[in-house]
């Protein structure tokens, strides 16, 4: 049921605690970036779960991270230092931004936890990226074999691909339904769906998705009256209060591009080569975040295409305060959207602070969209 998305998100630690009771022999790896190859972790019979912040003020990360690092990275580290994720057997990360990598290093240092780092390519726009990444995934696989005491074969990898790709296909099917004039699911429930998928056992979660698609979404309307169709883009964003505030106004978010949204699941695995090569190829081709989108900026065309396909009236770009990659990306993305005829509202957020101050700006933006629709 759709309510399951929020229940898993709100009770993520209790969910994993119960899962661990049912699967005492399986290990759990937390990860901090959506470039982490979950397929290989499932192939090792372990459970990958995404680590996110708690959206609460805290005072435990200041001595470990600079104040000019993004609030999200400091919030994530605080979760580890406060013991919220003490059930993890390991922590994993790929090449990512400096801020979240510092959270990872400090967590590993102070919690003395088994760690895995995959130095994924800085950019996918080179012919060397695929063979390089395949080699790094092979090394990661071998380390997982040592960690779990389990040999990982081709069939295991294919099973991991099947589990994760099924989740991706089902969530994309739901996103496609949001193209309709009266979307059957809100932007908030869509975001909760994606983060719940990141925080749960996908074999269990896939049955929930199938049930929602078959029994809940047909004929359903997320909003009773027509509303301004918005796109949400920017850095990591799982702020329930913000999305709730936007959709309580005369608006509905119908599409997004961020790592707790479509970017996480947008492409599936093309099965053309051996499994490791196929997995590497999938991550090379996934919609990039700003830190990997060079020398040619490809994100802008992808974002504009989404805005067109989902027929949005305007775009809200919300970035974490001090998020350098998105700060550098913001101007190019904004210009591309404006050139394509999409008004954009740029906001800078602190995930640990109230969202009330944004309400006036969002209301003003919606008034502009309404006046443009009249003419």
Annotate each PLM feature:
Residues 33-84, 89, 103, 108:
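An N-terminal, globular interaction/scaffold subdomain
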Residues 52-58, 120-123, 257-262, 349-350:
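Short, acidic/turn-prone active-site loops that include or flank metal/cofactor-
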Residues 1-27, 138, 142-267, 292:
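A charged, amphipathic alpha-helical module
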Residues 34-35, 39-52, 234-304:
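Redox- and metal-dependent alpha/beta enzyme cores, enriched for Fe-S-associated oxidoreductases
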Residues 55-72, 264-279, 361:
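N-terminal beta-loop-helix "entrance" segment that forms/cooperates
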Residues 331-375:
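Peripheral docking tails and interdomain loops at the edges
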Residues 75-146:
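Acidic/His-rich segments in extracytoplasmic proteins that coordinate ligands and/or metal ions
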Residues 80, 294-311, 328-329:
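A short, acidic, amphipathic alpha-helical segment used as a generic capping/interface helix at domain edges
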């Amino acid at each position: 049921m759709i309510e399951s998305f929020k229940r898993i998100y709100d009770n993520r630690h209790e969910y994993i605690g119960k899962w661990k009771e049912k699967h005492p022999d399986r290990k759990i790896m937390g990860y901090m970036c959506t470039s982490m190859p979950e397929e290989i972790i499932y192939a090792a019979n372990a459970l990958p779960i995404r680590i996110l912040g708690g959206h609460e003020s805290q005072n435990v990360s200041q001595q470990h991270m600079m104040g000019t690092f993004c609030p999200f990275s400091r919030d994530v580290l605080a979760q580890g230092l406060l013991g919220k994720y003490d059930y993890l057997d390991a922590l994993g990360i790929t090449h990512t931004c400096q801020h979240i990598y510092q959270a990872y290093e400090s967590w590993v240092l102070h919690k003395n936890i088994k760690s895995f780092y995959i130095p994924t390519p800085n950019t996918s726009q080179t012919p060397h990226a695929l063979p390089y990444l395949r080699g790094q995934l092979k090394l990661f696989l071998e380390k997982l074999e040592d960690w779990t005491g389990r040999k990982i074969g081709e069939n295991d990898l294919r099973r991991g691909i099947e589990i994760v790709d099924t989740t991706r296909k089902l969530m994309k099917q739901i996103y496609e339904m949001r193209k309709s004039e009266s979307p059957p699911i809100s932007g908030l429930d869509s975001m909760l769906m994606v983060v719940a998928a990141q925080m749960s056992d996908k074999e269990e979660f896939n049955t929930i998705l199938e049930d929602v698609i078959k029994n809940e979404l047909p004929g359903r309307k997320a909003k009773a009256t027509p509303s301004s169709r918005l796109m949400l883009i920017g850095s990591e964003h799982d702020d329930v209060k913000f999305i709730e505030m936007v959709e309580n106004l005369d608006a509905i978010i119908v599409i997004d591009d961020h790592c707790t949204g479509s970017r996480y699941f947008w492409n599936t695995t093309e099965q053309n080569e051996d499994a490791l090569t196929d997995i590497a190829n999938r991550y090379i081709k996934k919609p990039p975040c700003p830190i990997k989108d060079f020398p040619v900026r490809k994100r802008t065309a992808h974002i504009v295409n989404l805005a067109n396909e989902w027929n949005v009236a305007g775009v809200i770009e919300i970035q974490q305060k001090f998020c350098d990659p998105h700060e550098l990306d913001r101007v190019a993305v904004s210009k591309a959207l404006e050139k394509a005829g999409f008004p954009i509202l740029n906001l800078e957020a602190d995930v640990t602070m109230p969202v009330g101050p944004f309400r006036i700006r969002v209301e003003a933006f919606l008034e502009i969209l309404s006046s443009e629709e009249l003419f």
